A protein has these predicted regions:
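Short, flexible loop segments at boundaries between secondary-structure elements
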Residues: 161
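Acidic/glycine-enriched connector segments
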Residues: 4-132, 139, 146-158
Length: 161
């Protein structure tokens, strides 16, 4: 499938899901929409996020719970694999994502958001070929600017330069 850069990527999942939180979650959904990849996932009841209700442009389903861990586990359960993008040590919901992947024995790849890691992510994607890819990581308030960095990283990841 051609993308914004006019290149053919090594592997693109059919669908990208996330929980809709600020930061990495929304960067994943924004990149998916820019690349014309189906997107979705689960979010807390009331479309809860740290900046208020998650905008309706994101095609997310609400869980019955307002608790973030419920949507985190549901997105892991409904996906083929999880890509955990981070900067520094895993903590909070990002660490929970890793632990829930371990608990459910679901494949995941945790990687720092650095351009030199794009090839490693592409290689993992080609190996796993996840039809539905869950993408998770820190919220914007715990890593200011991560939305922008993550979106650029994902746009580069799904292209061959």
């Amino acid at each position: 499938m051609p993308n914004l850069f006019g290149n053919v990527p090594l592997f693109i999942p059919r669908r990208i899901v996330s929980g809709g939180q600020t930061g990495v979650d929304r960067a994943a959904l924004d990149a998916a929409m820019l690349l014309d990849i189906e997107h979705g996932g689960w979010c807390p009841a009331g479309r809860l996020a740290e900046d208020g209700p998650i905008p309706n442009r994101y095609a997310l389903q609400e869980t019955r719970s307002h608790e973030y861990p419920v949507r985190t586990e549901q997105n892991i359960a409904d996906s083929s694999a999880t890509l955990i993008l981070h900067e520094g040590a895993l903590k909070g919901g990002t660490l929970l994502t890793k632990r829930l992947c371990d608990k459910r024995k679901k494949p995941y790849f945790k990687v720092e958001i650095k351009d030199q890691m794009i090839d490693a992510v592409q290689t993992w994607l080609v190996t796993q070929t996840p039809e539905v890819l869950n993408i998770a990581g820190p919220r914007e308030s715990s890593a200011p600017g991560i939305h922008s960095r993550c979106k650029k990283f994902l746009l580069r990841t799904f292209s061959v330069e």
